[in-house]
From Swiss-Prot:
Annotated membrane topology: Single-pass type I membrane protein
Protein name: Calnexin
Ranges of compositional bias, category Acidic residues: 323-345, 525-547
Covalent lipid sites (S-palmitoyl cysteine): 502-503
Keyword terms, alphabetized: Acetylation, Calcium, Chaperone, Disulfide bond, Endoplasmic reticulum, Host-virus interaction, Lectin, Lipoprotein, Membrane, Metal-binding, Mitochondrion, Palmitate, Phosphoprotein, Repeat, Signal, Transmembrane, Transmembrane helix, Ubl conjugation
Residues annotated with N6-acetyllysine modification: 137
Segments of this protein annotated with the region Sufficient to mediate interaction with SGIP1: 503-592
GO BP terms: clathrin-dependent endocytosis; ERAD pathway; protein folding; protein folding in endoplasmic reticulum; protein secretion; synaptic vesicle endocytosis; viral protein processing
Residues where Phosphoserine is found: 554, 564, 583
Membrane-spanning segments: 482-502
Gene: CANX
Region of interest called 4 X approximate repeats, as start-end residue ranges on this chain: 278-345, 348-405
Binding residues annotated for an alpha-D-glucoside, in chain numbering: 164, 166, 185, 192, 425
Length: 592
């Protein structure tokens, strides 16, 4: 309303200026001043389109567990309190890199959109890193599910390295300040990447109930494309859920990317086969594995020439006219000069380099002409007997099966070795890997609340700071230049079709333009036919009138030159009827 009122004022003042143009100069100046004031008021009332729209502010508050947890840390205290740096050395490694001397810090992300939100940061590159913390109490695999969740942000991307966690097995020998790569763990979970191989590990160590030996069991690879989680430099939430019924789920950003069952979807399988191949069994010497054999009764045909060449000279070819038989194809370069440092005793007699014979350029060829070769129609090659089914074929030999002496059946692989600590034991060629909001719990609701209060705020802050749709399209095109072609076609094609549609319409003929009347309109052809009929009818009427007038004249002359009043009245009426008949309003209606 305010904008409309200001526009009305501008119109009124503009009218006043025009009316006062012939008036006093002082009045004109006053009106112009008023107009300038109104224009300034309109400009001031316009919104500032240059300033970017303010993003909704997201206030950070450290998450607090809403129930019982085995472990939780948001690092918002700003210290490594509760975490222990390893002092161990890695075995079978050069002393220069054997130490776990990688640096860890607690700090905010480099481009944090949540002031006050801190995390654990792997600071150095090309070093071994190891840090761990005790759980509030050991986790026992009984009737409750296990849920492990934490956040990772590859702030500088990732070349080669991991961001996985290890749940360290509860053993009497567990010493966190000596945590290293061979420290026993129960579960390893999290992202890992080297080259173009993007992984999301879920590995658990299963104890053989017969031998007591532990063996790693790897979950199947996720079907989802994991590359974006490593390259987009955003914070991602990784969740592992293990249930007492042996089912598992792996989630990224609260969406399932992998799921399965510990009994069916691990490699190698938890339970070995009931039977195995007998390692002592040997294939018999007379075992025939050949499905086809040469026909022993086949005989080489008498006319089979094994010595015939595959190619023969073309006898029908003729030497092209102008062929220079006496000219060599290459000649010494006449412009070449012997190098000054050429030593004939050491280098031998100097010879000019060969160049293409210039006389051959205008000829079909030079040198001795030879007939071209063609395929020999009589060539058959080495004769071989045809193959037939082997009547003695016994199939592919396999050793016999015997009962597996190491067979066992564990129907509850969920009941793994209890663990009492969480650790990060990593090697990375990229620094500034950000970890945050670790939680280990048995209640999904508590974990979801923790995620909403931590990762959920990060996601909201990132969404508030993200560019609009156009900005996101431009960013995507910068990463994938071929998208520019898609954008151009998407915009240009509809415009082209609209222009083509608007410019290619057929022009209507004048015969199809209707008159502004409610009366039925004739088609062009019918209208022309009616005009011809009316013209012929008019000519006949004129001819009849002329004859009538001549007859009346002659009658009048016979009657003494007098004309009756009745005849005088009939004449104007006939003329009026003729005019009415020629009027378009009295035409016949168009025939359907």
């Amino acid at each position: 309303m305010e904008g409309k009122w200001l526009l009305c004022m501008l119109l009124v003042l503009g009218t006043a200026i025009v009316e006062a143009h012939d008036g006093h100069d002082d009045d004109v100046i006053d009106i112009e001043d008023d107009l300038d004031d109104v224009i300034e008021e309109v400009e001031d009332s316009k919104p500032d389109t240059t300033a970017p729209p303010s993003s909704p502010k997201v206030t950070y508050k450290a998450p607090v567990p809403t129930g019982e947890v085995y472990f939780a840390d948001s690092f918002d205290r700003g210290t490594l309190s509760g975490w222990i740096l390893s002092k161990a050395k890695k075995d079978d490694t050069d002393d220069e890199i054997a130490k776990y001397d990688g640096k860890w810090e607690v700090e905010e992300m480099k481009e944090s959109k949540l002031p006050g939100d801190k995390g654990l940061v792997l600071m150095s590159r090309a070093k071994h890193h190891a840090i761990s913390a005790k759980l509030n109490k050991p986790f026992l695999f009984d009737t409750k599910p296990l849920i492990v969740q934490y956040e990772v942000n590859f702030q500088n991307g990732i070349e080669c390295g991991g961001a996985y966690v290890k749940l360290l097995s509860k053993t009497p020998e567990l010493n966190l300040d000596q945590f290293h790569d061979k420290t026993p763990y129960t579960i390893m979970f999290g992202p890992d990447k080297c080259g173009e191989d993007y992984k999301l590990h879920f590995i658990f160590r299963h104890k053989n109930p017969k031998t007591g030996i532990y063996e790693e069991k790897h979950a199947k690879r996720p079907d989802a494309d994991l590359k974006t989680y490593f390259t987009d430099k955003k914070t991602h939430l990784y969740t592992l859920i293990l249930n007492p019924d042996n089912s598992f789920e792996i989630l990224v950003d609260q969406s399932v990317v992998n799921s399965g069952n510990l009994l069916n979807d691990m490699t190698p399988p938890v339970n070995p086969s009931r039977e195995i191949e007998d390692p002592e069994d040997r294939k018999p010497e007379d075992w025939d594995e050949r499905p086809k054999i040469p026909d022993p009764e086949a005989v080489k045909p008498d006319d089979w020439d094994e010595d015939a060449p595959a190619k023969i000279p073309d006898e029908e070819a003729t030497k092209p006219e102008g062929w220079l038989d006496d000219e060599p194809e290459y000649v010494p370069d006449p412009d070449a000069e012997k190098p000054e440092d050429w030593d004939e005793d050491m280098d031998g007699e100097w010879e000019a380099p060969q160049i293409a014979n210039p006389r051959c350029e205008s000829a079909p060829g030079c040198g001795v002409w030879q007939r071209p070769v063609i395929d020999n129609p009589n060539y058959k090659g080495k004769w071989k007997p045809p193959m037939i089914d082997n009547p003695s074929y016994q199939g592919i030999w396999k050793p016999r099966k015997i009962p597996n002496p190491d067979f066992f059946e564990d129907l509850e692989p969920f009941r793994m070795t209890p663990f009492s600590a969480i650790g990060l034991e990593l090697w990375s060629m990229t620094s500034d890997i950000f970890f945050d909001n670790f939680i280990i719990c048995a209640d999904r609701r508590i974990v979801d609340d923790w995620a909403n209060d931590g990762w959920g705020l990060k996601k909201a802050a990132d969404g508030a700071a993200e560019p609009g749709v156009v900005g996101q399209m431009i960013e995507a095109a910068e990463e994938r230049p071929w998208l520019w072609v898609v954008y151009i076609l998407t915009v240009a094609l509809p415009v082209f079709l609209v222009i083509l549609f608007c410019c290619s319409g057929k022009k209507q003929t004048s015969g199809m333009e209707y008159k502004k009347t409610d009366a039925p309109q004739p088609d062009v052809k019918e209208e022309e036919e009616e005009k011809e009929e009316e013209k012929d009818k008019g000519d006949e009427e004129e001819e009849g009138e002329e004859k009538l007038e001549e007859k009346q004249k002659s009658d009048a002359e016979e009657d003494g030159g007098t004309v009756s009043q009745e005849e005088e009245d009939r004449k104007p009426k006939a003329e009026e009827d003729e005019i009415l008949n020629r009027s378009p309003r009295n035409r016949k209606p168009r025939r359907e």
